[in-house]
Design a protein with these regions (language model features):
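A residue-level marker of the well-folded mature domains of exported/periplasmic proteins
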Residues: 1-159
Length: 159
């Protein structure tokens, strides 16, 4: 797997970003995770012009482009309800002013199943994996140094 990463420094759509994304698609990139507000529009336009795919962010962005294969969604409703619950039960002082990470067990992350378009991974597969993440039997660890090997991964930092 080749993984290229670019910090956009802006949430704005631009012809420069669309041109760069088009170049990535032309050089073999299959999917771009367009994480950053309106920059999604530039990446989706490049994907449409190059038979590419896009992963949306924050909400289900499938209605914005036929190129969206899924979206990494924040469970905004669940997280707001969780925080408001802390206010109403009198325990907000436990979380106020602190950094809190919510995840699968809190229904605070997910993929949109109603607009599912992935072909090699089913909604049932996803739901089974999400349930394991929520119950703790599958732990997602961001410490890549624990991997047996990264020989099949190439990381390109684009500046």
């Amino acid at each position: 797997m080749n993984y290229s990463w670019l910090y956009g420094a802006s949430f704005a759509a631009s012809t420069e970003l669309q041109t760069m994304a088009s170049g990535w698609y032309e050089n073999g990139t299959e999917v771009i995770f367009a994480c950053g507000g309106n920059m999604f529009q530039s990446v989706a336009a490049a994907a449409a012009a190059n038979d590419g795919a896009v992963v949306g962010v924050d909400v289900d962005q499938s209605s914005q482009s036929d190129t969206v294969i899924t979206s990494a969604m924040k469970g905004l409703s669940a997280s707001v309800q969780w925080a408001c619950g802390k206010v109403y039960d009198g325990s907000f002082d436990e979380i106020g002013g602190t950094f809190v990470t919510l995840g699968a067990k809190d229904n605070a992350v997910g993929l949109p199943t109603a607009t599912w378009s992935l072909t090699k991974w089913t909604v049932d597969d996803y739901n089974a994996m999400l349930a394991k993440m929520a119950d703790g039997s599958l732990v997602v660890d961001n410490d890549y140094s624990k991997l047996d090997s990264t020989d099949s991964l190439t990381l390109n930092l684009v500046k």
